[in-house]
């Protein structure tokens, strides 16, 4: 449910010898990658797609980014994904830009991208997910019947803007809007699981953080009430796809839950016909 090939930007390890490349290696080590430089392989879209196929992944979500410090345009996401049926594009908007609402409608209605990613905690100024200025973003996504993806995790500059209770407030105000929480709002695992328990329109993608201390709580919840709301994600390039699939299968998910978290939940959420 979440990947970005390295060639998209230096931040994802596009250029060896840069400080960004070293940061990508560092993060890979922190989340348990066996090969901290595996992402070098995705220097082209063809190599990235080959890795997706080798990992046995039927469909991989490729997400843009639009923050004050890093932008990958939605047109670029379309260019990368459209030739490859196994790649699903998710648009991104900076909600503080004046054209944010128009860009959402363009990305969905003209480009055909499958959802909208926002990262309010990375904004200038940073915002909580429940900041009223974001309500028009949620409203237009609700009207377009597409999911909104919230990215928040330990790398959020200030974790005060990554509190799960803010997601709960949005879920209550927009009960028909699917809200997908990238990085599973780690490290606030108990809290976000509690929010997802209360609001069935909240989905969790813990991706690489499911392998860190406390991450087994996601598995425990998915073996119970969360089986329709948890989704697999690789967080590539910060974790290798093949290793992540293998490690994920060994986390202790019950057999009847695996189809949901690996495939069916994403298919339903993104209205795919795979």
Q: Where are the predicted features?
A:
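Conserved residues at the C-terminal ends of beta-strands
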Residues: 63, 119, 264
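Residue-level marker for beta-strand->alpha-helix junctions and adjacent short loops that shape enzyme
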Residues: 67, 96, 123, 155, ...
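Generic structural signal for well-ordered alpha-helices
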Residues: 45-49, 74-81, 104-105, 134, ...
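Mid-to-C-terminal alpha-helical segments outside catalytic/metal-binding sites
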Residues: 4-55, 59, 226-229, 239-274
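Conserved, mostly hydrophobic/aromatic
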Residues: 52, 77, 107, 116, ...
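Catalytic pocket-lining loop regions of alpha/beta-barrel enzymes
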Residues: 114-115, 127-231
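Active-site gating/metal-coordination segments in enzymes
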Residues: 58-59, 67-150, 155-156, 198
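Structural motif corresponding to alpha-helix initiation and N-cap regions
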Residues: 42-46, 71-74, 97-101, 131, ...
